[in-house]
Amino acid sequence: TFLTVIAAHAANKTLYAGKLKFDPVTSFAPVSLVGIAPIMILVSNDLPVKTVGELIAYAKQNPGKISFGSSGVGAAAHLTSELIMQVTGTRMVHVPYKGTAPALADLMSGNIQMLLDVPIGTMSQVKAGKVRALAMMSKERVPGAEDIPTIVESGGPLIESSSWVMFMAPAGTPKEIVDRIGDEVAKAM
């Protein structure tokens, strides 16, 4: 039996300390990284900002007035939003959702003002003009989304953040099996 995990898996040990019946780190062995994508900063069309620099300035002038959604407590987007607030000295309100779809719907309707997520689930709404992408949280522009600036180009601090998907095996799975499955996944990708 193998498990597919996302980046939030890495935070579970800390977020749910003492509440889990297993150790998210030591109970599994990594098999293969399947994919990785940078986090994108999205805002509602109603928010009067066009860059990350303007977003930071607006958040400082309006502490607690910007609400940001995430696909759930402990998700990469949630933790990255908290890091942005810590680094920039801003205060925003976290609204956790059960997945990206309801958060994106609320962003489009203006119920929340900001959402961080990977491009695959949100780019169609950006291209349709239903939300604005301020930046990718990467050092370089992202292939296929070259028109979206990096966070630094958009006036923000250099904070890189991404989400990933990984195959994991139960701890104690023989190394030969883990290596072979990892090699086969790499060939398939």
Where on the chain are the PLM-derived regions?
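Hinge/capping helix and adjacent helix->loop/strand transition within the periplasmic-binding protein
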Residues: 1, 10-102, 151, 164-189
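Conserved helix-loop-beta element of the AMP-binding
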Residues: 29, 55, 130-143
